[in-house]
Amino acid sequence: MQRFFLAVALIAATWLAAVPSPAQAAPCLLVTLTGTMSGPVLLNGVAGAGTLVRYGDDSSDCSTVKLQFDAGRGTALRLSQVDLDVGQLDAIFFTHMHSDHTDGFADLMQVRWNWNSTGPKLDVVCSADAPSPLGFTMSCRNLVVHIGDAFIQSGEIAQRISEDKRRLAGGPAELGHLITFDPRDEAQVVWSKGDVRVSAVRSTHIAGHASYRVDTPAGSVVIGGDAGNDLPAPPRPTSTSAQVEKLAQGVDVIVHSTMHPVVGPDRDSGMPPPVFYRQSATTDLGAMAKRVGAKHLMLTHLASQVGQSRHGP
């Protein structure tokens, strides 16, 4: 059984369910786009990039395991629109350290700290520190360690602890369980729980970028992030990532950011050519999905947004 719907919350979702044997609950995989905005752009209330993956069966409302991939602006609000408390997340995975993929993380962790300080820590899975040849380092570790610094420095953490001593003294960072890995061309398992396994590969966008695959008995999904081809610009056979294509062989669902030709360097779109070329083009993603045999392609991180011909203000 497969069912698709667009919820009132402006969240697109795909539902996959396996056929159960008699007297068994049907395992299911639910993939939800919690935000589809590309870059630090504000337009029509569209939330920042993020994907929620839920796995379970009929008896658990497909919610035994709940995983969030990236957390752009408004993620916690979008989760609330599908009746998911941030304290219920098992893990969050980051594809890379760009603010349009991480803006909502501080909000998510502050809310979890406020209401769930006595609950389990949240697994935060991401690349190890990734030095750039340009002389700086992309650091998910620093993001996690310092996620509550503004709240601590403003005095909010101390004030809220004075009202409820169950809250952790170190603020939201104490609720994060950091799991880092060194991305490689070959897939490696970076997280697992029960029947759910998450693998990762290196992919090209910025230093430390990774793409993920979730495998469950109900189906599989690849989260490409902002991956593009290793060659930074044409001529090249495709704009898509060879590593992501290998990771996605036989997958059920591909979730991937996309660049539409309308914002290409030959248009007056405001999109810098290097930014356009470091991501995957819409038509190339469709061709890749066909090559790997994917059943569904969910386009996200849309540049430009539907109905727009420019990127940004």
Where do the protein language model's features map onto the residues?
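Intrinsically disordered and other compositionally biased segments
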Residues: 15-18, 231-233
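Binuclear metal-dependent hydrolase catalytic cores
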Residues: 24-221, 311-313
